A protein has these predicted regions:
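Glycine-centered flexibility motif
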Residues: 8, 55, 81, 103-104, ...
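Conserved long hydrophobic alpha-helices within structured protein cores
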Residues: 46-50, 96-97, 152-158
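A glycine-rich, often tryptophan-bearing local segment used as a flexible ligand/cofactor-contacting loop or short
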Residues: 59-133
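Catalytic beta-strand/loop cores that center a nucleophilic Ser/Cys/Thr
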Residues: 110-192
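Helical hinge/lid and interdomain linker segments adjacent to catalytic or ligand-binding clefts
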Residues: 2-92
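Short secondary-structure boundary micro-motifs
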Residues: 5, 57-58, 105-106, 167-171
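Short aromatic-enriched loop/helix-cap "lid" or pocket-rim segments at secondary-structure transitions
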Residues: 16-18, 95-98, 167-170
């Protein structure tokens, strides 16, 4: 499969993107990585890819242009794939339709997470292709909370957190525990979002 990975933004992508690229190549994919999202506006170039992978933060001064947004929407809704990794789900204030594409995303000023720590990832649909051969596992990561989830997501993986009070935004903040979706698929037009 030919994959385009869009990287860059305010996060340590210089560390995570090479790991992601190695993983995807190791799985047999043909991978192109770019920090320049202008390719999204080039339908000819995008037509050469099977799926778009976002390992990027495109909000604030790095928000996609209207042409890039439209190119991305056309690519996905036209039947291609879109994989949104980690904080790539941040919903830009000026592009709320992104939430419809991703099915859920970090909302600046509303979403949060407890400190980086260990929690169990539960595979809720062992037969789902997104977790084929994977069983529950422990990980060290941030468990996102306060995410704006949309209807129509086919959730196959969750994480659980206890209630707690942690520093957030310069003050101690109560964070209600619960079970939160971590991985899902959904449709956007004729495309598949993962």
């Amino acid at each position: 499969m030919k994959l385009l990975v869009v990287s860059g933004g305010r996060h340590p992508y210089e560390e995570s993107t090479p790991v992601l690229e190695g993983f995807l190549k190791g799985a047999g994919h043909n991978v192109t990585v770019t920090d320049d999202p202008s390719v999204l506006a080039d339908s000819g170039a995008m037509g050469g890819y099977d799926a778009l992978v976002f390992n990027t933060l495109r909000a604030g001064d790095t928000t996609l242009s209207d042409a890039e947004q439209n190119g991305m929407k056309d690519f996905i809704s036209g039947g291609k794939g879109f994989i949104c990794v980690h904080i790539s789900g941040v919903v830009p204030e000026t592009w709320q339709e992104y939430l419809e594409i991703t099915g859920g995303g970090w909302v600046m000023g509303t979403s949060y997470h407890p400190p980086y720590g260990n929690y169990t990832v539960n595979v809720t649909q062992p037969g789902h292709p997104g977790v084929a051969g994977v069983s529950d596992f422990d990980t060290d990561d941030e468990l996102y909370m306060g995410i704006d989830y949309q209807d129509g997501n086919d959730v196959y993986m969750t994480g659980t957190s206890e209630d707690g009070t942690w520093p957030w935004g310069g003050k101690d903040t109560f964070m209600a525990g619960g079970t939160f979706p971590l991985g899902w698929t959904r449709s956007y037009g004729d495309g598949k979002v993962f």
